[in-house]
């Protein structure tokens, strides 16, 4: 069988099984099914408002359903699991069957529609829509819609988020089709967004190295050492530290005073300025000695003459 025909065959088989359950389990509150084919057989999960009625006394009803699925629909080793619906008012199939039964019992369509959609919204649904089509009143068919909240009609969210169900009400004038769409409370819509507040960044604190016990013992050891030291030694150490600080302060003050006396920025030490004066004095003394020697020589020459 080609792939296209296989898809058509599987879809048709699934629709036929769904219609079978809807007719067979209408009084039990049929709420839909899930079919999964595995190598061990076909796994079917039924959702019902009253699971006890689906199973039957001693499992009689569930065995009958299993035999029918295997013989009429050709399913290999069907395994049926029944689950109870937590909130029937949020299951579109159950709501559609209830509304169809209310119309068959003689409820006015507007009262039935508004009452049903109000119960859906009170259960926490984000949105709901009910469509009644057929001979609602009179001989002419028409369409009546009831809307509440937010509903998606197309796109991927309409298939994955919206829960839909259909029902049929058989009236004297003709049939009325019932279509129900519900968006459950936990649905995440694609256009929803959330604004987060700014996160306060805390200062980075380095984690201390070592075990917790070692970190707790370290302060105790330091305190023990300080307590065990002699008071006299502690006083001597303090006085020595104070004396060193005083000497350092005096040196700083002396240096500042010298700088103020010598000028803003001395380029050479004081000894370097005195050296040229000493050289000049030596030259003057040498010249004076030479003059004295010349004068003595002149006097000696005069005496000889």
Curated annotation (Swiss-Prot):
Protein name: Small ribosomal subunit protein uS3
Region Disordered, annotated ranges: 207-305
Gene Ontology CC annotation, any one: cytosolic small ribosomal subunit
InterPro entries: KH_dom, KH_dom-like_a/b, KH_dom_type_2, KH_sf_prok-type, Ribosomal_S3_C_sf, Ribosomal_uS3_arc, Ribosomal_uS3_C, Ribosomal_uS3_CS
GO terms of biological process kind: translation
Taxonomic source organism: Natronomonas pharaonis (strain ATCC 35678 / DSM 2160 / CIP 103997 / JCM 8858 / NBRC 14720 / NCIMB 2260 / Gabara) (Halobacterium pharaonis)
Role played: Binds the lower part of the 30S subunit head.
Start and end residues of each KH type-2 domain: 17-86
């Amino acid at each position: 069988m080609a792939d296209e025909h296989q898809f058509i065959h599987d879809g048709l088989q699934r629709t036929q099984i769904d219609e079978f359950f809807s007719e067979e389990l209408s009084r039990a509150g049929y709420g839909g099914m899930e079919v999964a084919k595995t190598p061990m057989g076909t796994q079917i999960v039924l959702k019902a408002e009253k699971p006890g009625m689906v199973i039957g006394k001693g499992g009689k009803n569930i065995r009958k359903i299993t035999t029918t699925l295997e013989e009429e629909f050709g399913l290999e080793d069907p395994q049926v699991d029944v689950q109870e619906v937590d909130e029937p008012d949020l299951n579109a199939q159950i709501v559609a069957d209830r509304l169809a039964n209310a119309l068959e019992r003689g409820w006015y369509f507007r009262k039935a529609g508004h009452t049903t959609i109000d119960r859906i919204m009170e259960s926490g649904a984000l949105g709901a829509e009910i469509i009644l089509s057929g001979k609602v009143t009179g001989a002419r068919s028409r369409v009546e819609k009831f809307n509440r909240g937010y509903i998606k009609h197309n796109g991927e969210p309409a298939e994955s988020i919206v829960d839909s169900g259909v029902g049929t009400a058989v009236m004297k004038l003709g049939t009325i089709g019932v279509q129900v769409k519900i968006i459950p409370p936990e649905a995440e819509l694609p256009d929803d967004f959330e604004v987060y507040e700014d996160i306060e960044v805390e200062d980075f604190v380095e984690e201390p190295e070592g075990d917790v016990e070692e970190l707790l013992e370290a302060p105790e050891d330091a305190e023990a050492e300080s307590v065990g030291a002699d008071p006299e030694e502690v006083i001597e150490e303090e006085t020595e530290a104070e004396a060193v600080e005083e000497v350092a302060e005096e040196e700083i003050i002396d240096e500042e005073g010298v700088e103020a006396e010598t000028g803003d920025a001395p380029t050479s030490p004081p000894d370097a300025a005195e050296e040229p004066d000493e050289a000049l004095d030596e030259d003057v003394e040498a010249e004076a000695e030479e003059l004295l020697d010349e004068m003595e020589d002149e006097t000696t020459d005069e005496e000889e003459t």
